[in-house]
Amino acid sequence: MIEIDGSFGEGGGQILRTSLTLSSLTKKPFRIYNIRANRPKPGLQRQHLTAVNAVKILTNATVKGDYVGSTELIFSPGDIQEKGDFVFDIGTAGSTTLILQTILPLLLNRKLTVTIKGGTDVPKSPSIDYIRLVFSKVLERIGISFNVELIKRGHYPEGGGEIRISNVRGEPQRFSITEFGQLEGFVGISHVSSLPVHIADRQKSSAEKILRRLKDKIDIRLDVREGEISKGSGICLSAIGKYGIIGADALGERGKRAETVGEEAALKLLEELKTNAAFDSHMGDMLMLYASLYQGEYTASKLTLHSITNEKVIRKFIDIKGEIKGSSPFLFRVQ
């Protein structure tokens, strides 16, 4: 059984999520201890427990230690289900997109539809629009497509969001994406939930003003939703290159001007673009698992502790001939 110290490196939930995914794909059981030991609230929280439960059900796994506050978990996967329609409810504003990341590789070329309820636009996790504008488009470039439907948005602290993942298809091949290439344009989504539409407009306008410094081809659409359980706003932007895609987002909050939200996302995007890496730092972390599975290489703008930790977890399950070169930007290559 693979033994994993959940406190090493970044020491957060990503260690558990990557372990769940790779354990299911390789059919290698694991024991993880010191789960989130470095966090203010150590152990499994509702969001992590939902990820465990989702993978448990999808893989017919045997699990010990799956309760709130648990700092040790033993996970023994079975066979991945071939078809079915499943619903997983976090019950809080915990991130639906982090659970999406965990289970997506398990759904590939299977007749599975998964609905996840919780937060869609919450701090310290990819927004649902980042998944739609950046993550899904990057996966298309390596041969994987999927549908992700945004049914309801969920902001912190109320949650109430809902997404549905289906039709995960593809024949991923070895890939090499090491340059961003010529900038083709910008796309984005500026949203409000149960708030005045002018907030989304102002977020959009302030972002456009900054992005025009590089290119006039900008397509930011508005997503205005009324009657949602949670109130909130945000904007997600992506820069489309000939080879790469760079994303950045920002969330609104009480007392924060809408113009500031748009400027924050746009300035983050321009900063990411300066390195000429194919992908942004968040995508650099998320793509590492796929590069390890399908022998890929890519560059990303900044090597984070998340990425370093993720690579070490991957090596626990897969015997990869991989290397990391540089830091800002960095190259990850698996041969």
UniProtKB/Swiss-Prot annotation:
**InterPro entries hit by this protein:** RNA3'-term_phos_cycl_insert, RNA3'_phos_cyclase_dom, RNA3'_phos_cyclase_dom_sf, RNA3'_term_phos_cyc, RNA3'_term_phos_cyc_type_1, RNA3'_term_phos_cycl-like_CS, RNA3'P_cycl/enolpyr_Trfase_a/b, RPTC_insert
**UniProt main location, coarse:** cytoplasm
- Superkingdom of the source? Archaea
One MF term in the entry's GO annotations: RNA-3'-phosphate cyclase activity
Catalysed reaction(s) here are:
a 3'-end 3'-phospho-ribonucleotide-RNA + ATP = a 3'-end 2',3'-cyclophospho-ribonucleotide-RNA + AMP + diphosphate
Keywords carried by this UniProt record: ATP-binding, Cytoplasm, Ligase, Nucleotide-binding
Instruction: Enumerate the active-site residues.
Output: H306 (tele-amp-histidine intermediate)
Enzyme's top EC category? ligase
An annotated GO cellular component: cytoplasm
Q: Where does ATP bind?
A: Q101, H282, M283, G284, D285
Q: Name one Pfam family in it.
A: RTC_insert
Which Enzyme Commission number(s) are listed? 6.5.1.4
Location of this chain's protein in the cell: Cytoplasm
Q: What PROSITE patterns does the record tag this protein with?
A: RTC
- GO annotation (BP), single: RNA processing
Which NCBIfam families does the record match to this protein? Answer: RNA_3prim_cycl (TIGR03399)
What does this protein's UniProt record list under function? Answer: Catalyzes the conversion of 3'-phosphate to a 2',3'-cyclic phosphodiester at the end of RNA. The mechanism of action of the enzyme occurs in 3 steps: (A) adenylation of the enzyme by ATP; (B) transfer of adenylate to an RNA-N3'P to produce RNA-N3'PP5'A; (C) and attack of the adjacent 2'-hydroxyl on the 3'-phosphorus in the diester linkage to produce the cyclic end product. The biological role of this enzyme is unknown but it is likely to function in some aspects of cellular RNA processing.
Family the entry assigns: Belongs to the RNA 3'-terminal cyclase family. Type 1 subfamily.
Can you name this protein?
Answer: RNA 3'-terminal phosphate cyclase
Instruction: Say which species the protein is native to.
Output: Sulfolobus acidocaldarius (strain ATCC 33909 / DSM 639 / JCM 8929 / NBRC 15157 / NCIMB 11770)
